[in-house]
Amino acid sequence: MSYGFLATNNNNEVLVSSDTRNLHFLQKRTTPSSITYTTNFYGGMRHWNYNFTNVSVTPIPFFTTPTTDYYAITKVTNTSGNNWTVEVMRSGTSTSVPEVYLFADPRAGSPTDNYGMIVYKSDGTTSFDSRLKPLTVTGGQAVSHPTNPKSSYSSSGLTAKYCGSIQNYDTSVEYDISNFIPDQYNSYNISGQPSKPIFSYLSLAQAERELTLSESEEECDGVPDGYGGCIGIQRTYYWTSKYFAFYRGGIRWNNGNLRAGWIIAEKGCNWTYYRDTEFLGIGTGSDSGTGGNWPYSNETINTANNTVIISNGAKYD
């Protein structure tokens, strides 16, 4: 640029520039506004919404990690006007909840001090305002997620009949299974951790895995013919159940060690049933049915180059 303001550090990295807008602290929520989903099955999962008001530009959220589970921001929604909702997802069964810090460029802030340093863009709008608690980045990491959320998948213990391993569709009672719990991650060591680490990580990585089971049975209302057939009415039943888990990328923090792994975001199963009836080899009718919910596409996407930004929440408490 031929004019303006530019401040860099010893590594020639940009700290403040009149060409770009710095992030500044706006608001903090210590508890979620609502719990959108919770279960202790499949290793446990929690979905929370944090509501923010009076935010005039698109915000960037950061969160704490009070447990050593996996966390991720899965949605930032402009619900109406200047109102925003941040959805945070976490694995595990703990009752602890993360705090969420909201940052945005200085156009969204309202300074109360009369003194400080302000940097303007060429259009006259503010790019930096020291009175608004600018974001201090203490660390960062580009992370990638393993291609497979789990080292191996087994259908052991699952039934092909009516998805009966996870739900009784007559009583709506749910059951727990461990066949999809993720165990794969990539690990990164981060030096110089702050006193209260907060993280900006938007979950982009997604994966879906399925386990399909099929089973059939024959029933003879008559006399077996000795060759595997039936003299009389014969019914043949076919069942197929497709169990699935949908994963989102998450990060785990433990005293300077950062892991990029997976969180089960959704689970379910779809079943199909078919019955064929014959009398002396002649078809006399059939019956079929289906239930449950269909899985997503069985693929893995966006696993590489996901950015994690680290700051110190203590500066904004």
Model-derived regions: residue spans:
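A cross-kingdom feature marking solvent-exposed beta-strand/loop segments within repeated
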Residues: 67-97, 279
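Broad, structure-driven detector of short, well-ordered beta-strand segments within folded domains
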Residues: 241-256, 261-263
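Ser/Thr- and Asn-enriched, surface-exposed coil loops between beta-strands
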Residues: 77-87, 253, 257-260, 268-270, ...
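Extracellular and analogous surface-interaction loops
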Residues: 49-56, 78
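Extracellular receptor-binding modules and their adjoining Ser/Thr/Gly/Asp/Asn-rich linkers
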Residues: 1-49, 90-243, 251, 267-317
